[in-house]
Structure formats: C-alpha cells, structure tokens
Amino acid sequence: SNLSRKDSKKSYTYNIKDFPLGIIGIEKIYDSYLRGTPGIEQIEVNAQGNYVRRLSFINSKKGKNIQLTINSELQNYTHQRIGANIGAALIIDAKNGNILSSASSPSYDPNIFSKTLNKTAWEKVVNSVNAPLINRPLKGLYPPGSTFKPVVALAALKYGLIKTTDKIFCNGVYPLGNRDFHCWNKFGHGKLNLTNAIAQSCDVFFYEIALRLGIKKISETAKLLGFGSYYDEFFGVSKSIIPDKKWKLDHYNEKWQKGETLNVGIGQGFLLSTPIELAIMTANLINKGNVVIPNIIKSISGEPIINNFRKNNNFNIEHLDIIKQGMFKVINSNKGTGWKSRTEDKEFYIAGKTGTSQVRIISANERATGILKNKDLPFSKRDHGLFIGFAPYIKPKYITAVVLEHAGGGSKSAAPVGRDLLIASRRIIEGIDTNIVVS
C-alpha cells in the first residue's frame, strides 16, 4: 500500500523502499513490534561517487513474531459454514475470551492491496452493495433481537422485579396507550415463568418486565455485560448503541417514550450491537460473575499473552444460573425456539438464544390480512437471523455468535450454523465428534 504523507513523517523507517508497514488491524496496532529496525551503513565516497571506505555499520534487527489465537482450520470452517450468506460468525474461548475464529461474509482477497491496485478493481470492491470491506464481527451493527432478552431477564432479577416462580400471561398482544405491541406468536404463549419465557422467546413477557424496569436499569445492565465497551486491541471496532433518556435527548432532542422501552426489551428500536459484543455478553452471562475481555494475541516472540478475568460483583451467581437454565431450555426443551439445533451428546449439550430482528415496520393492515413471509419480501426487507450459544452446558468451553443478514428467523437460519460451529470447535480442537438430532 502507498504511504500517506502523515505516515511518512512518523519515522524514517516509513520512508525506506519495500520496508514492511502495517496499515490496518493487528498489523497496524502492533507495527512497532513487527517492523524491527533497519540496518545502517555509513560510507565515504569520493567526488566521482566511488566507494572509499566504510565509516560505520549497524546490523538490522528482525521484528518480533506475533501468534494469533485464531485456529486456522476452524477459521476456514467458519467461512465455509456461512457459505453464500451475508453476515458474521465468530467463536471465542469461553474461559478467557480468546477469539478462535472470526468470519465476515462476503470477504475479499487482502492480497489485492499488496500490489498496485487499479481503479476498476478498487471500485468493484468499495462499491459492492454487500460491503465486503466491512469486518462484520467487529464493525457490523445490528439490532440484537431476542438474543438481548437474557440481558433484560437478568436486570429484572438483579433489581428484584421478578421471581423465578412468577408467571406472566401472554395472549399475543400487549396494549400500551393507544398502541398494541405484538408477540411473534399471535396466538399467545399463555402463562410463562422466566426460564420458559426465555426458551419460547415470548415478546409479551419481555414487554412487561421491560416496562417494570425502565430504560435506565436495562441500559446499565447491558453495559455491565459488555455492551458499549471499546476494546483497544481491535482497531476500528464499532461501539454499540445502548440507548437511554439522555442518549435520545442528545441525538434527537426528544423525550424518551415508554413504547421505546418495550422495543428495547425485545432487542429492537434504537438498540444496536456488534457480533463480538454478543459473544462477550454470552461469556459474561455464563462465567459466574467473571468479566471476559476479548483477545486475539496468543504470544509475542514466544511469550504467551495471558488474558485474565476481571471480577464482577454486580451480579448474583444464582441469577446468572437462572439465565443459563433458560438458555439451556431454548435448545433442549421441545418448546424452545432452538429445539431443532440440539445434540444427542450429553457431554456436549448446547445452550443458547435465538434471535430475529426486524428491519421494517409491519402495518396494522398487514397484520389484519396476514404478515408477509420473508421469502415474499424484497431481500433488503427480510429479517436478520441471530444466534448466541455455548457448549458444553456444564463447564462451557466454546461460545459462538452468528448474525445472518436478511436470512429470516434465527431459529431456522442462524441457530443451525451456531450449532455446527460449536460442534466443529470440539472436533477440530479436541478431536471429538458430536452427533446432532435430525428432526
């Protein structure tokens, strides 16, 4: 890549022809480690420019080698499993936040930047409607949909606004003022407790507890679980939008409305998050109060990088276990939204949460005549499919987050991908196969 004038002023090494330079991502962040030091030879020449003698000589020093946490085989499988879908998928180590794979689709060949790039090739990449230059796991911002419901459930437990024995009735509609807020199940779920509401992803249940909480408590809980954090390690990571009253006033100069709290309660509205945040949120839910920080550096010149937990005393471990039980039911209860993505292996039960995020407004007229199916909509109006998951349920090792743009409901689109990524992690890293249940 050609140097900018700004780069050329940073160090004399930036002006040496063919001297390697990191300009994006990890190579930019760790450029001072990787670059090394060029050798210097000072010589004397005569008036004709002929060599006379050497005055001084300093040997060059090699840069340091950096090993990433990425498992190349798992990385290749992750790309393969996304296939032709547009979106993101990643796998992290549940114990320490190490990123084992991170795939963005569509992708591009980075080697095109290692040589002179003609205008036609550049415009083809930069003007592509599917935006291959966006690193979706780190920079893609999406409504998290129902993958956000465990956050709302934990907030309700944290602030004592619900007990595990409490039940809320869902008839398919939640009236607020002069507007009806609908459940995805128009016939309703009946009476549900907290873990079953997570399992069946009941919107009405989460409308009710979101209204009890208010946006401030939801926002604060989300931030404690990692939403809105900025990780310096990942240059250019997008920061999620965790809205509250101040945020709306700052951005729209308008007061917050209760209906907006209901939308956030099901992961919609102004709320936006990145796939890496969804993975870290999952880790923070299942690690008994330990806060996980994402990491992609395994070692520098052979010296291992230890990515330690940070203790978080803001959540009751019993409350975290209740959320974990609800996520187990998502996959392993026959009424769970992820039931078709379960495994047969008791040593590798999967738990998780499916999500579907709307990108359009459904009119009252459409609800009356029948909501259009995704396949009958223009591609850009179809729902995003999401899934967060971990395995095994007991002593989790792997966490995945999957977002497939305009692929339809997460139960059918993203959950099978997430299941396969968790199974592949076990197979590739531990050499153990896992049987799935074919429904």
Regions found by a protein language model. Name each.
Residues 1-88, 103-136, 141, 386, ...:
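Extracytoplasmic/periplasmic proteins that interact with beta-lactams or build/remodel peptidoglycan
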Residues 27, 75, 219, 320, ...:
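Hydrophobic face of alpha-helices
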Residues 45-55, 95-147, 151-402, 434:
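Beta-lactam-recognizing serine transpeptidase/beta-lactamase-like catalytic domain environment
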Residues 77, 81, 155, 221, ...:
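Generic non-transmembrane alpha-helical segments
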Residues 89-94:
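Short hydrophobic alpha-helical segments used for membrane anchoring or interfacial signaling
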Residues 303-311, 416-439:
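Short, gly/Ser/Thr-rich active-site loops of penicillin-recognizing serine hydrolases
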Residues 405-408:
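A generic structural motif
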